[in-house]
């Protein structure tokens, strides 16, 4: 991710403007502390959404495999990017497999007025937060995004009626996926 930042002008001029069918696989997405301050993968969601590039963030190997195959099909035109964190698969998130959908509710409670939203490995923390809130009789749902940008109308419809929408991500604030969602809501 941090090396992609250094080539952002090429992403704009050599890929996005021409709409070329390039697939970017972005390793070390999110916070990667031990790699050093200048190697954090917290900018790519913001800058790739600025050029209108569809962006995906699988939460497990099954989703990564599925979306790699989907985005390599002939009918999938234009540039696309898949970002994934450093390290191995999160065991908890691996249990959810792959639905092939742009988003999934991983936790639902009847009468929930709040939804906690995230993507990739951060969903593990979201699920833990939902469990703790449920222990305190606070009903909430957990929504996992796989396709981060652009949002589908169906996803916006799924969250627009919640009284409270909380978004967590390892990304800079300005231009983040959470900021895009706030704008849409």
Tell where the protein language model's regions lie, with residue ranges:
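Conserved, well-ordered active-site substructure
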Residues: 14
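Thiamine diphosphate
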Residues: 4-8, 17-50, 73-185
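Conserved glycine-bearing catalytic or ligand-binding loops at nucleotide- and phosphate-handling centers
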Residues: 58-75
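Short, well-structured alpha-helical patches and their helix-loop capping segments
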Residues: 40, 56-59
């Amino acid at each position: 991710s941090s090396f992609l930042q250094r080539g952002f002008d090429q992403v704009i001029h050599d890929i996005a403007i021409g709409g070329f069918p390039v697939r970017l696989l972005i390793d070390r997405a999110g916070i990667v502390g031990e790699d050093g301050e200048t190697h954090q993968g917290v900018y790519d969601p913001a800058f790739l959404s600025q050029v209108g590039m569809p962006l995906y963030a699988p939460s497990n190997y099954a989703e990564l495999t599925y979306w790699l195959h989907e985005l390599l099909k002939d009918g999938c035109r234009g540039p696309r990017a898949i970002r994934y964190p450093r390290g191995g698969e999160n065991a908890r998130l691996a249990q959810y497999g792959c639905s092939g959908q742009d988003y999934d509710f991983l936790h639902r409670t009847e009468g929930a007025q709040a939804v906690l939203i995230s993507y990739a490995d951060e969903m593990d923390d979201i699920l833990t937060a939902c469990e703790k809130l449920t222990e305190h009789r606070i009903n909430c749902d957990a929504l996992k995004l796989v396709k981060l940008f652009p949002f589908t109308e169906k996803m916006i419809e799924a969250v627009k009626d919640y009284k409270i929408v909380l978004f967590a991500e390892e990304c800079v604030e300005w231009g983040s996926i959470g900021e895009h969602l706030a704008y849409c809501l």
